[in-house]
């Protein structure tokens, strides 16, 4: 049963995520209908009656005892509108009362002639009804002491000032009449509610959503509240008063909270980029994983509330609220599976689309052409999420702005026409209206008003008109009038019978169109995949197969169809295609199949001038290149086919360099994506150079296993690293620490005098200079952020070292652009117009060269990796011992490197691993110069006897976007490590992790090689020790073992054949390494 519920809820959530628009629009429409249906139930009657009314009329009969005296308030009776034209009322004395109220923004309010003062800012004007129109015209504008007061409509923004003040008064009155314990209880409940609401936004920020996920979470609960209120009021007839709602909802929110929704959103956000599954499955799994816990929590609370409703059925207010709360929880549960799941599905789509766009922007900032960057980003998204049917092809900040503006516009529009406040009670009269009350546009008849009205002989009918509000004329009044005018016109247009129908029709058409396009996009992707599968499984046509022909020289050639690599759900497969022309075929086959006469060079030149080079054959284009009419670098542009350009270039260079080897396949060129190479990685391409790629591992790095790819032609390197991985894993794996992250660029500038150069240095080193340049630098990139500027002065030349974070890119192009702009900004805006820029790179970086500044200050990622190797593992796996390793490391890596004057070379062979991993993962192999800076340290644990080994590498320069990482094989190796592309939530984390992997691989290789060297030395010493014991006449006995442990010193090694064999194996490994 439980598994059935989990499957059902997961299926519902998947359906919602697959059809997000339907499952978002329908609940929103239902919630809107519910809102419109119940809003009238909570509008106070006195406000209802005053809305749009022309006034309220009262009648007082004639009594001789009250003639020309104070009337009796109890004898005033309200007149129904149906009877206002009865004779008794038409013959009575007709008087109109105009209430006036002045908003106190000034010390003195104007005195209206013939008006009676009620309070400091309240007056009433009593006039005969037949003079009312003239009086109202005179009241439109009043001038007093140079200040113009304008009559205002209270249905504008100013009414909310009254609502807030009245609400505060009501709260204050309620507090004064409540028990202290009740006040404390309600206060704690409200604190809990606001804590839960704020926590939603805080938790959603942690998973990368600043506003919309939290807002959607609250919207889902709000919809549940409205739907529950509709069912409770209209169907169950258990209306809950506003007082009960205001006191009970905080308790409900505090008890239930939003933890399940936040947890589901967290799982979806984490899986949106890490999981290759499509969006509906990601959302469905997240929801089904919380099905049982969410059902349990909600059902327990619902059961408790219903029990309370049954037990306390005589307490109507409590019973109704318990029923409403149960309905809220039920609808909330349903909306989690529908509305909220649909929102999560859209959010995942947007995140994946945004990540693709961010990758494209980062590649463009790295200097890669926009076309290549767009293709790489799109293909990367396809590879990461092969099952994804993504219909978000672009994402722009304007979309977010549009959503914010629409949301604010909705609330603003509603605020102007809300016309009520839920803070009011639903009863008329009482103490609140004992005086002249302006919270309703039409106040009730009060004692203050009745005392000013004389009673006629036939009675008196007094009509109290809506209150006229006055405000001093100013900018805010004019702005309010403008906003009110615009919204009123818009509202009038919406209310129009014809326009409203068109709007409804357009809304329905928009929904249908969106659904149609989303389904069409999904169908197109599905149809494409089916077509690919069909092409793969179709039998090969005989006309496409290779044909073997024999030429006059007896050589054999085969014309084969090209193989194009296509990515699909199951990986990369090869699909045979029929060549459109003879470009892919050999010359010999062309002669036999379609002997075509090659145009002379002059004719080819004419075609070149006409811009129709692509119509020529490969041989004809090649003749243009050989004849010097077409540059080698222009082939891609002229032919508009990168692969064909490679073929033609090979033909041309084979003739120019007299290198027939390029006419063969010894240097391969086929089956390669040259679109990623052109404009990004290489120029004048003639093929690609295959390198064998091995894998070392798994190596546990920070409690996570990694298989490390290594491209190398050096034998035993991968095997040696594997042995180091095994030993490290036996001790628990590698621990890594990132101590610094910042790429550098060090331009050189020059000044006319030393004084100016020194002043510039001091200014750059100051806080003002650092802040100014940082602001200019950061404006050039979305990713690069300047950390620090270091300067050095040599004569009149000033060297400036910029250190910058560059996200997941290695960042050289990104930082160079920022440096250029910063220097230009210094010249043009900061008063250093006499500064001359010698070079953007002044070797103060330092890039691709040995330099102590990189060793000391660091460059790129500074990583320290350490591991503990148990003593028995050193013996059994590494075939050595701890003391020998420690002694060897001191003598070789520390003392030996120091004697050689090395800078950053205190290691055995760090460059081996750095270069191998760099080649496999698309890094710049030239940067192994500074990236291989490493010091290897080993020491023996005094308590356990284990080996503690570490490598410190202060200048590892890597990136996971840009450069060679855009090539598919190298990108695949980054995928193997799980660090391809930009990190979805923490920019720079992927590149940092790659640097940690590089350092950990170096640690494994260092450990293995040093163990082999130490074992070889031990064998040599041991053999010498054995020979010294053998009797040899006339021979000089020498017993000087270079490295011995406690066993060797007492001769026990000689008697232990196993140790001898172990050391011999270690020496063999040493020789191979």
From Swiss-Prot:
Recorded metabolic or biological pathway in which this protein acts: Metabolic intermediate biosynthesis; (R)-mevalonate biosynthesis; (R)-mevalonate from acetyl-CoA: step 3/3
Keyword line: Endoplasmic reticulum, Lipid biosynthesis, Lipid metabolism, Membrane, NADP, Oxidoreductase, Steroid biosynthesis, Transmembrane, Transmembrane helix
A GO biological-process term: sterol biosynthetic process
Skewed-composition ranges (Polar residues): 1046-1055
Catalysed reactions, as listed in the record: (R)-mevalonate + 2 NADP(+) + CoA = (3S)-3-hydroxy-3-methylglutaryl-CoA + 2 NADPH + 2 H(+)
Location in the cell: Endoplasmic reticulum membrane
Segments of skewed composition (Low complexity): 542-565, 1030-1042
Composition bias type Acidic residues, residue spans: 579-589
GO cellular component: endoplasmic reticulum membrane; peroxisomal membrane; plasma membrane
Residue positions binding CoA: 720-726, 877-879, 1021-1022
Induction record: Expression is not affected by lovastatin or fluconazole.
A molecular function (GO) term: hydroxymethylglutaryl-CoA reductase (NADPH) activity
Positions with a binding annotation for NADP(+): 781-783, 808-816, 1026-1027
Annotated region described as Disordered, given as residue ranges: 542-589, 1025-1056
Protein family: Belongs to the HMG-CoA reductase family.
Main function: HMG-CoA reductase; part of the first module of ergosterol biosynthesis pathway that includes the early steps of the pathway, conserved across all eukaryotes, and which results in the formation of mevalonate from acetyl-coenzyme A (acetyl-CoA). HMG1 catalyzes the reduction of hydroxymethylglutaryl-CoA (HMG-CoA) to mevalonate. The first module starts with the action of the cytosolic acetyl-CoA acetyltransferase ERG10 that catalyzes the formation of acetoacetyl-CoA. The hydroxymethylglutaryl-CoA synthase ERG13 then condenses acetyl-CoA with acetoacetyl-CoA to form HMG-CoA.
Alphabetized NCBIfam families for the sequence: HMG_CoA_R_NADP
Name the record gives this protein: 3-hydroxy-3-methylglutaryl-coenzyme A reductase 1
UniProt source species: Candida albicans (strain SC5314 / ATCC MYA-2876) (Yeast)
High-level lineage: Eukaryota, Fungi, Dikarya, Ascomycota, Saccharomycotina
């Amino acid at each position: 049963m439980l598994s059935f519920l989990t499957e059902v809820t997961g299926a519902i959530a998947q359906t919602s995520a697959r059809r997000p628009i339907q499952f978002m629009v329908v609940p929103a429409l239902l919630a809107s209908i519910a809102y419109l249906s119940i809003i009238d139930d909570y509008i106070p009657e006195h406000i209802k009656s005053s809305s749009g009314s022309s006034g309220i009329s009262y009648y007082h009969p004639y009594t001789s005892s009250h003639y020309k005296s104070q009337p009796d308030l109890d004898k005033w009776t309200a007149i129904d509108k149906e009877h206002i034209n009865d004779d008794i009322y038409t013959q009575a004395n007709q008087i109109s009362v105009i209430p006036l109220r002045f908003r106190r923004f000034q010390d003195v309010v104007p005195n209206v002639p013939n008006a009676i003062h009620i309070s400091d800012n309240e007056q009433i004007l009593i006039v005969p009804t037949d003079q009312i129109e003239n009086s109202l015209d005179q009241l439109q504008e009043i001038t007093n002491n140079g200040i113009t007061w304008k009559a205002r409509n209270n249905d504008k923004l100013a009414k909310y000032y009254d609502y807030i003040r009245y609400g505060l008064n009501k709260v204050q009155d309620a507090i004064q009449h409540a028990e202290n314990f009740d006040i404390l209880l309600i206060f704690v409940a409200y604190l809990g509610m606001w804590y839960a609401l704020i926590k939603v936004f805080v938790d959603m920020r942690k998973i990368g959503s600043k506003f919309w996920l939290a807002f959607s979470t609250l919207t889902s609960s709000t919809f549940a509240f409205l739907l529950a209120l509709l069912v409770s009021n209209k169907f169950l007839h258990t209306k809950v008063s506003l007082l009960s709602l205001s006191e009970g909802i905080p308790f409900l929110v505090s008890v239930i909270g939003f933890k399940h929704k936040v947890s589901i959103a967290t799982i979806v956000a984490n899986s949106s980029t890490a999981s290759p599954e499509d969006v509906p499955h990601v959302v469905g799994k997240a929801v089904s994983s919380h099905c049982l816990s969410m059902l349990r929590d909600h059902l327990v609370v619902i059961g408790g509330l219903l029990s309370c409703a049954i037990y306390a059925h005589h307490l109507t207010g409590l019973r109704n609220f318990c029923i409403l709360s149960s309905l809220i929880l039920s609808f909330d549960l349903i909306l989690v599976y529908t509305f909220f799941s649909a929102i999560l599905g859209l959010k995942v789509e947007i995140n994946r689309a945004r990540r693709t766009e961010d990758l494209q922007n980062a590649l463009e900032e790295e200097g890669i052409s926009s076309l290549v960057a767009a293709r790489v980003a799109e293909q990367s998204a396809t590879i990461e999420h092969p099952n994804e049917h993504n219909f978000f092809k672009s994402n722009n900040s304007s979309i977010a702005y549009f959503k914010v503006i629409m949301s604010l516009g909705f609330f603003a529009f509603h605020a102007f026409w809300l016309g009520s406040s839920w803070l009011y009670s639903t009863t008329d009269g009482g103490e609140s209206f004992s005086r002249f009350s302006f919270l309703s546009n039409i106040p009730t008849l009060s004692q203050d008003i009745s005392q000013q009205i004389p009673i006629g002989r036939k009675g008196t009918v007094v009509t109290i008109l809506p209150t006229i509000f006055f405000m001093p004329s100013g900018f805010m009044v004019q702005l309010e009038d403008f906003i009110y005018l615009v919204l009123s016109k818009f509202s009038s247009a919406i209310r129009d019978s014809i326009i409203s129908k068109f709007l409804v029709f357009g809304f329905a058409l928009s929904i249908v169109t969106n659904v149609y396009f989303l389904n069409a996009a999904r169908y197109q992707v599905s149809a494409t995949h089916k077509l690919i599968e069909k092409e793969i499984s179709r039998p090969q046509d005989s006309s496409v197969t290779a044909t073997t022909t024999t030429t006059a020289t007896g050589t054999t050639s085969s014309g084969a169809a090209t193989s194009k690599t296509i990515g699909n759900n199951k990986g990369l497969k090869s699909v045979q295609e029929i060549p459109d022309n003879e470009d892919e075929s050999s010359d010999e086959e062309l002669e036999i199949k379609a002997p075509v006469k090659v145009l002379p060079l002059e004719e080819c030149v004419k075609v070149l001038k006409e811009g129709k080079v692509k119509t020529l054959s490969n041989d004809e284009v090649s003749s243009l290149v050989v004849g010097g009419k077409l540059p080698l670098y222009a082939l891609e542009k002229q032919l508009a086919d990168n692969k064909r350009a490679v073929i033609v270039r090979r033909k041309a260079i084979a003739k120019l360099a007299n290198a027939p080897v390029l006419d063969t396949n010894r240097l391969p060129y086929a089956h390669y994506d040259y679109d990623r190479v052109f404009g990004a990685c290489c120029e004048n391409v003639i093929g690609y150079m295959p390198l064998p790629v091995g894998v070392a591992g798994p190596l546990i790095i920070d409690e996570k296993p990694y298989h490390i790819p290594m491209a190398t032609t050096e034998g035993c390197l991968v095997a040696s690293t594997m042995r180091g991985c095994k030993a490290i894993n036996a001790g628990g794996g590698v621990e890594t620490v990132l101590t610094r992250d910042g790429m550098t660029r060090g331009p050189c500038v020059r000044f006319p005098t030393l004084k100016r150069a020194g002043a510039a240095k001091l200014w750059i080193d100051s806080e003002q200079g650092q802040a100014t340049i940082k602001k200019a630098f950061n404006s050039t990139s979305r990713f690069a952020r300047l950390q620090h500027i270091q300067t050095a002065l040599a004569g009149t030349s000033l060297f400036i070292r910029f250190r910058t974070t560059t996200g997941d890119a290695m960042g050289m192009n990104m930082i160079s652009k920022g440096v250029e702009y910063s220097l230009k900004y210094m010249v043009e805006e900061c008063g250093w117009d006499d500064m001359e820029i010698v070079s953007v790179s002044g070797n103060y970086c330092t890039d691709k060269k040995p330099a102590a500044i990189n060793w000391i200050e660091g460059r790129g990622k500074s990583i320290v990796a350490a591991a503990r190797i148990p003593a028995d593992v050193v013996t059994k796996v590494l075939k050595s011992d701890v003391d020998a390793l420690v002694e060897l490391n001191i003598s070789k890596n520390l003392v030996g490197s120091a004697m050689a004057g090395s800078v950053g070379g205190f290691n055995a062979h760090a460059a081996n691993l750095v270069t191998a991993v760099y080649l496999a993962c698309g890094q710049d192999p030239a940067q192994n110069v500074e990236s291989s800076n490493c010091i290897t340290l080993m020491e023996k644990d005094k308590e356990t006897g284990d080996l503690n080994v570490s490598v410190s590498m202060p200048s590892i320069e890597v990136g996971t976007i840009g450069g060679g990482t855009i090539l598919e094989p190298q990108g695949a190796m980054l995928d193997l490590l799980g660090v391809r592309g930009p990190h979805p939530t923490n920019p720079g984390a992927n590149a940092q992790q790659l640097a940690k992997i590089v350092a950990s691989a170096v640690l494994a290789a260092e450990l293995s090689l040093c163990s082999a060297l130490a074992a070889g030395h031990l064998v040599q010493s041991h053999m010498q020790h054995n020979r010294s014991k053998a009797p040899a006449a006339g021979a000089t006995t020498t017993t000087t073992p270079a490295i011995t442990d406690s066993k060797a010193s007492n001769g026990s090694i000689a008697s232990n054949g196993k140790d001898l064999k172990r050391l011999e194996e270690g020496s063999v490994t040493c020789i191979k390494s």
